[in-house]
């Protein structure tokens, strides 16, 4: 009797659609299919754009139950790159992000809200410059499917604005904030 109940339970579990369960992904930084970019005003006349070259993370995503999705990212702040070595050295210094003391920034989601049509609000705790604050990333599901190497992938884009004072970072020139743009592609585990 126990064997037949076990077999029945196993058969039911195997018959459940795979889409009914969240899938876990590793962010594809090795294949350069993900980026964390920033844009900050330069003296109020133009913008400086840059990126963080080194980061890692993972996410769990279920199209049928968005609220169960999760995101975790770790950014190496010493990898900040604005395509200008002297400026990068200054931004990484104690005058601004103090990457020597705070070499990592982390984001851990606490809530994902489905806004419809592939749009999501991803709220979580960002730790930057030794300060942890809640932020919301306005994200969009780009798509998911098989890749040419036999794996499965899912991709998202997102934006958020960070107020520097919220993280005890001095104002950079005339800008009190930095705009972040995220391109995230994950490979299913």
Swiss-Prot record:
Residues 1-22 form the signal peptide. Keywords: Periplasm, Signal. The keyword Acyltransferase does not apply. This is UPF0312 protein VPA0850. Its main location: periplasm. GO terms for cellular component: periplasmic space. Belongs to the UPF0312 family. Type 1 subfamily. InterPro entries: Lipid/polyisoprenoid-bd_YceI, TTHA0802/YceI-like_sf, UPF0312/YceI. It is found in: Periplasm. SUPFAM superfamilies: YceI-like (SSF101874). PANTHER family: PROTEIN YCEI (PTHR34406:SF1).
């Amino acid at each position: 009797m126990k064997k037949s109940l076990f077999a029945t339970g196993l058969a039911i579990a195997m018959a459940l659609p795979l889409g009914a369960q969240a899938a876990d992904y590793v962010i594809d930084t090795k294949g350069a299919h993900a980026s964390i970019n920033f844009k900050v005003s330069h003296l109020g006349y133009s913008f400086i754009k840059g990126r963080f070259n080194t980061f890692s993370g993972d996410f769990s995503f279920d199209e049928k139950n968005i609220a169960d999705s999760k995101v975790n990212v770790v950014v190496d702040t010493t990898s900040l790159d604005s395509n200008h070595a002297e400026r990068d050295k200054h931004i990484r210094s104690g005058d601004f992000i103090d990457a020597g003391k705070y070499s990592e920034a982390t984001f851990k989601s606490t809530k994902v809200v489905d806004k419809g049509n592939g749009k999501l609000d991803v709220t979580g705790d960002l730790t930057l410059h030794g300060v942890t604050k809640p932020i919301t990333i306005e994200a969009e599901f780009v798509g998911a499917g098989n890749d040419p190497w036999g794996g499965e992938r899912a991709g998202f884009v997102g934006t958020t604005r960070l107020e520097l004072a919220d993280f005890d970072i001095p104002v950079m020139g005339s800008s009190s904030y930095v705009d972040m743009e995220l391109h995230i592609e994950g490979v299913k585990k």
